[in-house]
UniProtKB/Swiss-Prot annotation:
Residue span, HTH bat-type domain: 517-569
Protein's UniProt name: Putative transcriptional regulator HVO_1357
Gene disruption phenotype: Cells having transposon insertions in this gene are hypermotile.
Pfam families, per database record: BAT (PF15915), HalX (PF08663), HTH_10 (PF04967), Response_reg (PF00072)
Keyword field: Coiled coil, DNA-binding, Phosphoprotein, Transcription, Transcription regulation, Two-component regulatory system
Role: May be part of a signal-dependent gene regulation cascade that is relevant to swimming motility. May be involved in the transcription regulation of target genes.
Organism name: Haloferax volcanii (strain ATCC 29605 / DSM 3757 / JCM 8879 / NBRC 14742 / NCIMB 2012 / VKM B-1768 / DS2) (Halobacterium volcanii)
């Protein structure tokens, strides 16, 4: 069985976020910026032109990335309209138009010259969101500073009105003199933001080579400790105690960390309170963490963020620094880091499950109180089997085979259940039907997937049945069993066994695929690959690839989709082969 994961966000989550609007008539670039920014702590929308942007703009938009050179309604027009409407949003001009002194009086907040990089776009958006909370005079200073920086890239003699740059600098000095203290404080705040962003990028790069959970945790501590005083990773044991599994900074030894102090950051459910800051930690704990260097610092603070993936709590990261080392922005970014680490741990476990020569198989008995599928089986007095499940942020999409009841009856019964948001008949046969339903009331399956397990089988008859999970051999099986059996009533583990996988070589996979592909399909696949058609953004359009092959775009798509289907079928046919019998 295939277990999928989706990173889709619920409407409620997106509504609570800050909104970034990308405006560009180059749809590929606009989509690329959205792709870069997706998954950050804000919602991203696109407008493919000035008119579309004016229709979308309202007081819910926080940051606008705005192209200047667009047909009909230019970026300059959009910027003017934003200010005339009195919309309180930050605007970054993002354009290939080389800056000149005409920009001095334009009321933007930042100016980016294309081509732009992913890090440049992300950092600009993050900074502008922070600047939104600045006093108006301080915001004006940073906007003027951005204008000066854009013009500094030009030779003064080439500027249309060189004296305008001199006037700008005089104005910049005057604004700074008026708000000197506030500007210094905000500069320090932005500096911390930039250092934390750089730290996150360092962690992302370092995690690429980490292959186990232990490696991930130690790598994170090493990178974080390079930028701060020290860092430790904590895990909550089955007995409810805290255990330090990785540490770095000042020669810190995980075994020597007294964890009673940090325990305050954990709730009764064992989850860390995200962004919990200890303003000044006790002397004994300082000495344990910082050793002989403890006396060199006037005071030390600690930031505790959870390491989690969806609903799965892996532990916590504790970062130590000087007392003023953390603010709301850096705490929020460290929370993102905790989520990144949790995602990395989950992905590592999933890879080891996928690539391991052996896996651990866990079998559970489930009763009618285990979830909506068990209750549906009982209500219809029928047999259900789970064919596939996709993890969504707001629940699961389940594909089930129904025997002993029609697909229409199953859909009707599912719709009557308050825990099912959507149901449809996929295929209705005489003896068996296939139904898709979406629900947030399958906590057992959601918990298993979030812990990195693969749902192999779920069979139910008249309300009860068995659930079979596969999990990596080196995963924390005890934690998984505890999480699954406590996710819902009527669930108990009945068997645990190690299963050897059948091994097929890469050559056998290629032979299986070659036997299915026609010469034309193989050529279309290879040409699309080497031409960059599968890259983001695309290196070649479908029209360009089709032209190189001497075929029409519709014919290209027909061959390409057929070849992709055969490739995917071959992959999953091998992936889902039953374990070899010994």
């Amino acid at each position: 069985m295939v277990t999928e994961r989706s990173a889709r966000e619920s409407p409620e989550q997106r509504a609570a976020e800050q909104v970034v609007l990308v405006v560009d008539d180059d749809e590929d670039l606009a989509d690329t910026c959205r792709y870069w920014l997706d998954g950050e702590r804000f919602a991203v929308e696109t407008a493919y032109g000035g008119e579309e942007a004016l229709h979308r703009l309202d007081d819910t938009v926080d940051v606008v990335l705005l192209d200047r050179r667009m047909p009909n309604v230019t970026g300059d027009d959009v910027l003017e309209e934003i200010r005339e409407r009195g919309l309180d949003c930050r605007v970054a001009m993002m354009t290939a138009v080389e800056p000149d002194t005409d920009i001095v009086e334009m009321p933007f907040d930042a100016y980016l010259v294309k081509p732009v990089s992913e890090s440049e776009v992300k950092e600009t958006v993050e900074e502008l969101l922070v600047r939104s909370g600045f006093e108006s005079g301080v915001r004006e200073y940073f906007a003027l500073e951005s204008t000066e920086a854009a013009l500094d890239s030009r030779d003064v003699e080439e500027l249309r009105e060189p004296e305008a740059l001199s006037d700008l600098r005089s104005r910049l000095e005057a604004v700074r003199a008026e708000h000197e203290a506030a500007i210094r404080n905000r500069e320090a705040q932005l500096d911390r933001l930039n250092r934390t962003n750089e730290l996150l990028r360092d962690v992302d790069r370092a995690l690429i080579d980490a292959r186990t959970r232990d490696e991930i945790e130690q790598t994170v501590c090493d990178v974080v400790a390079d930028a701060h005083e020290a860092a430790v990773v904590l895990r909550r044991t089955a007995a409810g105690t805290l255990r330090c599994t990785a540490a770095a900074g000042h020669g810190l030894d995980p075994a020597g960390v007294d964890l009673d102090f940090v325990d305050e950051a954990f709730g009764v459910d064992g989850a860390a309170e995200d962004g919990f800051v200890f303003e000044d930690i006790p002397g004994a704990h300082r000495a344990a963490v910082l050793g002989d260097d403890a006396d060199d610092l006037d005071a030390v603070s600690a930031l505790c963020v959870s390491i989690d993936y969806r609903e799965t709590m892996y532990g916590a990261l504790v970062v130590y620094d000087e007392t003023d080392g953390f603010d709301d922005e850096s705490a929020g970014l460290f929370s993102d880091l905790g989520a990144t680490v949790g995602n990395g741990i989950n992905a590592t476990q999933s890879k080891r499950l996928l690539n391991g020569d052996s896996v651990v198989e866990l079998e559970f008995q489930v009763g009618r109180d285990a979830g909506v599928l068990a209750r549906l089986s009982a209500a219809l007095d029928c047999q259900l089997s789970l064919d596939g499940v996709t993890r969504l942020d707001d629940g699961l999409a389940c594909f089930i085979s129904v025997a002993g009841a029609s697909g229409c009856d199953a859909v009707a019964a599912a719709i009557d259940a308050v825990d099912v948001s959507q149901a449809r008949v996929v295929a209705d046969g005489d003896e068996e039907s296939v139904v898709e339903l979406r629900t947030d009331a399958e906590a057992v399956l959601s918990t298993a997937i979030d812990h990195g397990a693969s749902v192999e089988r779920l069979t139910l008859s008249e309300g009860s049945g068995t659930l079979t999970l596969h999990v990596a051999a080196d995963a924390d099986h005890g934690a998984l069993v505890e999480a699954v059996t406590t996710a819902a009533a009527g669930v108990s583990v009945v068997a645990k066994r190690e299963v050897e996988r059948s091994v097929q070589s890469a050559d056998s996979f290629r032979r299986a695929l070659d036997s299915k592909l026609t010469d034309r399909q193989r050529t279309v696949l290879e040409t699309s690959l080497v031409s960059g058609y599968f890259e983001w953004p695309r290196g070649s359009t479908a029209e360009e690839v089709a032209d190189s092959l001497g075929i029409s775009p519709p014919t290209l798509h027909e061959h390409l989709r057929t070849a992709e289907r055969k490739l995917i079928e071959t992959y999953f046919d091998e992936l889902n082969q039953a374990p070899a019998d010994d």
